[in-house]
């Protein structure tokens, strides 16, 4: 898939990022992963992000990532697969090349490791990764890797395969400046934790889609919310926010890392063998899983 094709796919509907299942020995479990990806691909997501943030990219080795991408491609049907990519520049370049060799359709460039960097350094990092692959690249603006509008414009000038921008800062002023400056040069995705909580604000800033974590275990509900959002049906959006997303937010906020662990628990609760989260995260308690189960059961479509 060429960069412009993945750019179009990213903007064509609701997106998600499958959790990465691990077995009893803490190894990637391909068979249950493929079963889950196949199920998700039946709910019309144009793109799934393999080995993304909710897929515990931060806990994966670079060698595991292409194996996950291959497993996703084999089971996703016509759904495009974009892989997580990141760490230091040279590691990220290597991951990008390995994802392309594994048949991936693009990469999501997550923040580099640990250190803060000036805009010129961020520019050099993103440019180097873009130049390592012919695939479309999406940058994830968050934490220690926040590109300003002028830096992003330079990158778009110099990197024709930079086609997407995902925001995890929540800084609506900055993202509106970026969409005003960049226009249709990029596809824009909301990327805050539990993105539905922020979707209406981002829609006002010209972000027409986002990646939904809960799509992993309640895809029909996620699609219902997204359809209402795009139709301007505020009553339906508020009903789902109050009955599902705000209670889920309360559970997710109980402990650091639950933005991932709660999603993985949800996948297990709807019948998939997702396994545990890897350290340094921790799984929900039994009591918390019961709370989540009741929430899911009340919203089965």
Curated annotation (Swiss-Prot):
Keyword field: Lyase
A GO term, aspect molecular function: 4-hydroxy-tetrahydrodipicolinate synthase activity
SS bond list: none
One of the GO BP terms on file: D-glucarate catabolic process
Pathway: Carbohydrate acid metabolism; D-glucarate degradation; 2,5-dioxopentanoate from D-glucarate: step 2/2
Superkingdom, taxonomy of origin: Bacteria
Leader sequence segment: none
EC number: 4.2.1.41
A Pfam entry, by short name: DHDPS
InterPro entries assigned to the protein according to its UniProt record, in alphabetical order: Aldolase_TIM, DapA-like, Dehydro-deoxyglucarate_dehyd
Chemical reaction(s) catalysed: 5-dehydro-4-deoxy-D-glucarate + H(+) = 2,5-dioxopentanoate + CO2 + H2O
Family of this protein: Belongs to the DapA family.
Protein name stated in the entry: Probable 5-dehydro-4-deoxyglucarate dehydratase
Origin organism lineage: Bacteria, Pseudomonadati, Pseudomonadota, Alphaproteobacteria, Rhodobacterales
